[in-house]
Design a protein with these regions (language model features):
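Alpha-helical coupling/stalk and coiled-coil linker elements that connect catalytic or binding modules
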Residues: 232-236
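A well-structured
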Residues: 1-231
Length: 236
């Protein structure tokens, strides 16, 4: 199946949240590893389906940010994603506390528990509103980047379409392309600065709400860094 043929349907958020809650309850009530494993596979299937719909909306919105249908879908996902993250966090906690943890680790490896512990440090219901605001700002940034229409040598190009000219063998042409791109960024400097400033303050607030000194520690956790730390990076 081609990507363009993959069906998209906005999920019923309340129904999906209830499905996750039911799976979590069943998982906690499991009396054997076989029973817990069966619920685990159900949760994986549901999670993959929901994530597929989210990714379809995101990619198709990126392909054409002027598409009003997927623009509306991104508005939905910007609000829905933090709520679904709360469901995932509850599931991760159930996995971490499971009496069958050793059985899961024996079959699937311990990495998923390492990642679950990291994810648990990166989330709290206290930052749900900030997460939704962050998603909207990131969407706004993507729209701004996609809106670029840069005049160059009689044509009009997007940022990606201008890239070949920036790598042209001719020095003068390369320089002109870089200057054309720079002029566009300069023209929209206030918009970029506004998004950046809001994100910095928003993420700093998120980090502090979770008990960290700022965003850096939270940022490492959110990126799922499981094999090196901020201290390791500072050595370089």
């Amino acid at each position: 199946m081609k990507f363009s043929e993959m069906p998209y349907q906005r999920p019923d958020l309340d129904a999906v949240k209830q499905q996750f809650a039911d799976l979590c309850a069943r998982f906690k009530a499991a009396e054997s590893y076989a029973e817990a494993r069966a619920v685990f596979l159900e949760e994986e299937k549901l999670n993959k389906h929901v994530d597929t719909q989210a990714q379809l909306a995101s990619v198709r919105n990126t392909i054409d940010t002027r598409d009003t249908f997927y623009d509306e879908e991104m508005n939905f996902w910007n609000e829905a994603a933090p709520q679904l993250q709360e469901c995932q966090n509850a599931w991760s906690r159930a996995m971490l506390d499971s009496p069958f943890r050793a059985d899961f680790a024996a079959e699937y490896g311990d990495l998923m528990f390492v990642n679950a512990e990291i994810a648990d440090k990166a989330f709290s219901p206290a930052i749900l509103d900030e997460m939704a605001q962050e998603n909207k700002l990131c969407t706004d940034y993507g729209k701004l980047i996609a809106s670029a229409q840069i005049p160059f040598e009689g044509g009009v190009y997007t940022l990606s379409q201008l890239s070949p000219f920036k790598n042209d063998p001719d020095d003068a042409r390369r320089l002109a392309a870089w200057k054309a791109e720079g002029a566009w960024y300069k023209e929209h400097q206030a918009e970029f600065d506004g998004i950046y400033d809001k994100l910095v303050h928003l993420r700093d607030t998120m980090g502090k709400k979770l008990g960290y000194e700022g965003y850096t520690t939270l940022g490492y956790y959110r990126m799922g860094r499981n094999c090196y730390t901020k201290a390791d990076v500072e050595k370089f």
